[in-house]
Amino acid sequence: MPPKPKITRDMIIDAAIKVIRKTGYESINARTVSGELHCSTQPVMYHFSTIDSLKQAAYAQTDQMHTEYLMDIPPDRDPVLGIGLNYIRFAVEEPQLFRFLFQSGYAQESSLLEMIDSEELIPVLAAMQDGTGMSMEKTRQVFLTVALFAHGYASIIANNGLEYDEKLVAGHLEHAWNGAILAAVQEENEHEETV
């Protein structure tokens, strides 16, 4: 029976994420990851036949971390506004991981519209629909508006184009949320009047 590897697949993925946090996803290679682990490149190449497969594994784990971060909402906060603020705060606290998730081309979904149709979002959309009383189509429309707004803010902050001010961001996010709901309700009312 061969000896059990001392450097595991999970250790390598964790090391890759540490490298990304420090210097960005572009710097992931067998040397940088093995340097983080203080080992030769052999364990990295043993567990991952290509660096791209390592990046994909690191992406999946980072995506899971991001989802958990987003869903950690205080009980007294509106869920959608909480998710939006957490999305932006993640870009503030983890700018390199944010860039890896949303600006590297490793996303499984090829567009934001595909993300909105993903199964993982159904509970969030259902909660929004219950809270607003709108159709699922209008709920998706409102979510897309708020998501685009939050993503824009987060991208600007992650790329050092703006200082983070939570009070200001929360106010803008709430205005976007309320405006999107108001526009969706107005559209529904106008549609009902024409029918």
Language-model-detected regions and their locations in the chain:
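Helix-turn-helix
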Residues: 11, 15, 19-53, 57
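Short, hydrophobic secondary-structure boundary micro-motifs
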Residues: 29, 99-101, 110, 165-166, ...
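N-terminal intrinsically disordered/low-complexity leader segments
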Residues: 1-7, 188-195
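Hydrophobic alpha-helical connector segments
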Residues: 71-97, 143-146
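Amphipathic alpha-helical packing segments from all-alpha helical-bundle domains
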Residues: 108-134, 140-144, 171-182
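Amphipathic C-terminal alpha-helical segment
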Residues: 100-103, 147-165, 179-190
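Alpha-helical structural segments
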Residues: 7, 11-18, 22, 53-72, ...
